[in-house]
Design a protein with these regions (language model features):
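Extracytoplasmic ligand/sensor domains, especially the bilobed periplasmic-binding protein
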Residues: 139-245, 293-318
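Extracellular/periplasmic periplasmic-binding protein-like sensory domains
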Residues: 285-360, 431, 458, 462-466
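Bacterial lipoprotein signal-peptidase II cleavage site
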Residues: 19-31
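Solvent-exposed, acidic/polar segments of extracytosolic/periplasmic ligand-binding ectodomains
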Residues: 38-67, 393-469
Length: 469
């Protein structure tokens, strides 16, 4: 069951689309680290700003629509699958970042003077309908969360007129749904291509024999197909990639897959699945003395636990990200402040990439609430907040990630590449401050996103034409 859980967990890789967050998207994305010291936190954590943006929190006289679970507090739900017994704590970093944000925001007076209250919501992977019922009954909005089987939120999501500013989305149903705005958009048919363009320019010879090793679950198969479609749209990347599927529930041995990789003379490898599973593949390759010249993976592999557990086996594995790097907080003030806020307001919370995505979602939600209150007679109302969020055309989460356009709903053309070395991650591209750094720590490609053809899942369930996308 634990192997099954990890296979399901990878379904949320994207977030930055990820990021595909996004961007890429990832259940295990980001570098797990420790929070800053209380001494560091005390200096800037409550400065009235976050990174390069003014804090959206503070005093006011707003009220919450009483017909939308309104009351003396603004009730928000950050759904996770933390209670899945085979993998306890799945995506708990989303909720941990939410708790830190709420503590930080309430210290400043809440949002427009209304204190935030967290409605803890656990879908435990397989209990999404029950979790959705709870949120409909108790929460004003869903903020900063994400569920592996997010397509199961519907139709109840629309029936109760819920709104969502998610940390990440997984399925095409959710990614293309109405009633939500993503801080780092992850549409199913538009994907970042910057990492492929980098490989084309810098490692062309290593693209001669590409292979994608993907889990056979529907979600991971769709990600592999999306990557293959992106590869074909970019063009000039060598031969057509072959996709080999492994059992998402786990294999007794990955030696046969390693042998196939060697026998085929694979020069380029992308793995679609959970980092722990890939460690087994890498070690199987080590045992037969074979290594593809270039290994590039999505954002869920930018994970310090992956690098440290894999050790030398992970050396050279490249992962893309659209978020500030944990390893360089001195270069990214928003990252340093995020660590400070975690240290002060949730010191025992897990710090990882999904937490950054959740925090950005909360910042966007609070910003949208402020805009709504200005035009809605001081009343915080769902559709008003949703429309205010949709109107935001430039967003970086205060500098937590590359610039996105939530209104347009497309991924960023910018990003960075991290490479595993000696049990940790180091920046590969762009070097901060170099000519390649053309966007405050990231590189933006002229053709950094692409429309990709293909059917990656049923989008109709997430649609409610009365609400708009």
């Amino acid at each position: 069951m634990r192997r099954i859980a990890r296979a399901f967990a990878v379904s949320s890789l994207l977030v930055l689309g990820a990021c595909s967050a996004s961007g890429g998207d990832s259940a295990d994305s980001g570098s797990d680290t420790t929070a800053a010291s209380d001494t560091t936190a005390a200096g800037s954590v409550d400065s009235g700003k976050f990174g390069d943006m003014d804090s959206p929190c503070g005093p006011g006289n707003a009220t919450v629509d009483p017909t939308q679970n309104g009351g003396p507090t603004l009730k928000v739900a950050t759904p996770t699958d933390k209670g899945f017994t085979a993998l306890p704590g799945l995506d708990i970093e989303l909720e941990d970042a939410a708790k830190a944000f709420i503590g930080w925001c309430n210290k400043q007076g809440g949002v427009q003077g209304v204190q935030l209250e967290l409605v803890e919501t656990d879908a435990a992977l397989l209990q999404v309908p029950a979790a959705m019922e709870k949120m409909c009954a108790e929460a004003f909005a869903m903020v900063g969360g994400g569920l592996v089987f997010d397509d199961q939120e519907f139709p109840r999501f629309h029936e109760c007129k819920m709104i969502d500013i998610p940390g990440y989305t997984v399925t095409a149903t959710k990614a293309e749904s109405d009633g939500k705005v993503e801080p780092v958009p992850n549409p199913s048919n538009v994907k970042p291509t910057g990492w492929l363009l980098w490989a084309k320019e810098n490692r062309a010879a290593d693209l001669a024999k590409p292979l994608f090793l993907a889990g056979n679950a529907v979600t991971t198969k769709n990600v592999a197909l999306q990557l293959k479609s992106s590869w074909e749209v970019v063009g000039g990347l060598g031969a057509e990639p072959e996709i080999i599927e492994y059992n998402s529930a786990g294999e007794a041995s990955y030696a046969p897959y390693a042998q196939q990789i060697k026998d085929k003379g694979v020069t380029y490898l992308s793995f679609i699945g959970a980092p722990d599973t890939f460690i087994a593949v890498l070690k199987a390759l080590d045992e037969i003395g074979y290594r593809p010249a270039l290994i590039m993976n999505d954002g869920n592999f930018y994970d310090q636990q992956f690098a440290s557990k894999a050790g030398a086996s992970a050396d050279g594995v490249i992962a893309r990200t659209a978020y500030a790097s944990f390893e360089n907080p001195d270069k990214f003030p928003a990252m340093q402040q995020f660590l400070d806020i975690m240290a002060k307001y949730n010191p025992s919370g897990k710090i990882a990439g999904l937490g950054l995505q959740s925090f950005s979602a909360y910042l966007l939600f609070a910003t949208a609430v402020n805009k709504c209150v200005e035009t809605n007679n001081n009343v915080i109302e769902r559709e008003c907040v949703l429309e205010s969020a949709k109107a935001i055309t430039s967003w970086t989460g205060g500098g937590l990630h590359t610039e996105t356009n939530p209104s347009e709903g497309k991924p960023s053309t910018c990003g960075a590449l991290m490479v595993a070395e000696e049990g940790t991650f180091k920046r590969l591209f762009p070097e901060i401050g170099s000519a390649d750094d053309n966007s405050n720590g990231w590189h933006c490609w002229e053709n950094g996103i692409a429309d990709i053809p293909g059917d990656f899942g049923d989008v109709s369930k997430g649609k409610d034409p009365s609400r708009g996308s």
